[in-house]
């Protein structure tokens, strides 16, 4: 499916969904920097609509790519820390208390702020 160009008004509505934050990591983003992520990827049959669009920072949009929300969450849980722990410098920093790995509540920003 070919992507369409979002209008300024549509971009603004998507941006305001989470008050200028990335829907996934929660970092503050400027509307000019915002990337639009399709919650269900177009390649997976998702609609090219505002309802299927989330504001995303560049990094989250890149790594989520065409993954489902479930698969993206599992990639974060299993992949990131596992890959970091393979790095000698990470293990040293962790051993000496220079960094700590915190437990993640397994919720994206948009899930944490739901009313």
Feature-to-residue mapping (PLM):
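Short, flexible coil/turn micro-motifs enriched in small/turn-prone residues
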Residues: 21, 40-41, 92
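N-proximal short alpha-helices
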Residues: 26, 42-45
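Short beta-strand-alpha-helix junction that forms the catalytic/metal-binding core
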Residues: 44-63
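Activation segment
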Residues: 33, 43, 64-66
